[in-house]
Design a protein with these regions (language model features):
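Fe(II)/2-oxoglutarate
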Residues: 1-36
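A short hydrophobic beta-strand segment most commonly corresponding to one strand
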Residues: 168, 236-250
Length: 265
C-alpha cells in the first residue's frame, strides 16, 4: 500500500487495503445485502476531511472548464419524442435536466482523485462489494473519473442508467435540495413495468426512497433497473460529485445524462 492512500481514505475505519480483515469482510457483506435489496449502499465519511478539501480545491480551480447544459429528456435518456406511443406513455414524459461535467483530463496526473481512482485497493474493494469480478477502470480519458457539477437550479430528472453500476463521491453538498431519490428495482430484465414507472413520473412517492449524502460519503449504486433522480439544487452553493467509473468492459461506450464537449451519449 502506498502511504498516500492513507492520507485520502479513512483506512482506520475502512482498511480497504486488507480485504481479509474482519472490518472489511463485514462491510462488504453489508454493501452486498443493501445492493441486493435496495440497489444502493453508502459508506459514510470514506474520504478524510483534508483530502476532501484538496479535491474540492482541485475542482474549483477548473470550474471554467465545466460544460453546463440544459435539455429535456425522458427517463430512458432520450430527447426525441416517439409519437407512435400513447400520449401518457412514460417514454413520452420529458423532464428538464440542467447540470454539467468536468472531464477527467482537466486534472493533473498527480491529482487527488486521479490517484485514488487508479489504486488497486479501491478497484478490488468495489469489486468485492458488487460481487462482480473482474471489473476495470474505464479507458475513456475524459470520463473515467469526471465530476458532475450542479449549480443552483441544477436538476437531474428521473432516469435509468445505461450501465450496471456507478460510484459517486460527494465532494460538496448544496445549502438545500440536491437530494438523491430512487425507486429500487422498479423494472427488471424483460419487464419494463411501464405502469409503475408512469406513476412515479406523475408524482406517486409510494416507492421513493431518499438518500442525503454528506461530503466524503461513497455511494455504490445499481441504476440500470432503479429509477432515480437528484432534486433541484437550492441556495448559493453548487453540488459537486465525482463519478469514478469502473466498468465490465474498459473500452465500452456509455450513455450519460448530459453531453460533454466530446458529445457523450
Amino acid at each position: 500500500m502506498n502511504d498516500r492512500l492513507n492520507t485520502i481514505v479513512d483506512l482506520k475505519r475502512y482498511p480497504i487495503h486488507d480485504l481479509n480483515s474482519t472490518i472489511i469482510k463485514n462491510l462488504v457483506k453489508k454493501c452486498k445485502e443493501e445492493l441486493d435489496q435496495y440497489s444502493c449502499s453508502t459508506i459514510p465519511n470514506f474520504i478524510l476531511p483534508k483530502s476532501l478539501e484538496v479535491m474540492n480545491s482541485e475542482l474549483e480551480k477548473q470550474l471554467d472548464e465545466v460544460y453546463m447544459s440544459k435539455e429535456s429528456i425522458n427517463a430512458y435518456l432520450y430527447a426525441k419524442d416517439d409519437p407512435s406511443l400513447p400520449d401518457k406513455h412514460p417514454k413520452r414524459n420529458f423532464m428538464e435536466r440542467y447540470n454539467g461535467y468536468l472531464n477527467s483530463d482537466c486534472f493533473p496526473k498527480n491529482s487527488e482523485m486521479k490517484y485514488l481512482y487508479e489504486t488497486e485497493e479501491l478497484l478490488k474493494f468495489v469489486s468485492a462489494c458488487l460481487g462482480i469480478s473482474p471489473i476495470y477502470r474505464w479507458a475513456d480519458p475524459l470520463a473515467c473519473h469526471a465530476y458532475n457539477v450542479m449549480e443552483p437550479d441544477g436538476i437531474l430528472p428521473w432516469h435509468f442508467d445505461s450501465c450496471e453500476f456507478t460510484l459517486s463521491l460527494m465532494i460538496q453538498k448544496p445549502e438545500k435540495g440536491g437530494i438523491f431519490e430512487y425507486c429500487p428495482n422498479i423494472r427488471a430484465p424483460g419487464n419494463e413495468n411501464f405502469n409503475e414507472v408512469k406513476k412515479v413520473l406523475e408524482g406517486d412517492r409510494s416507492r421513493v426512497r431518499q438518500l442525503k449524502l454528506e461530503p466524503g460519503d461513497l455511494q455504490i449504486f445499481k441504476g440500470r433497473f432503479t429509477l432515480h433522480r437528484v432534486t433541484k439544487v437550492e441556495g448559493q452553493k453548487s453540488r459537486y460529485m465525482c463519478i469514478p467509473a469502473y466498468v465490465l468492459d474498459p473500452y465500452s461506450c456509455l450513455l450519460y445524462t448530459s453531453p460533454s464537449p466530446r458529445d457523450r451519449g
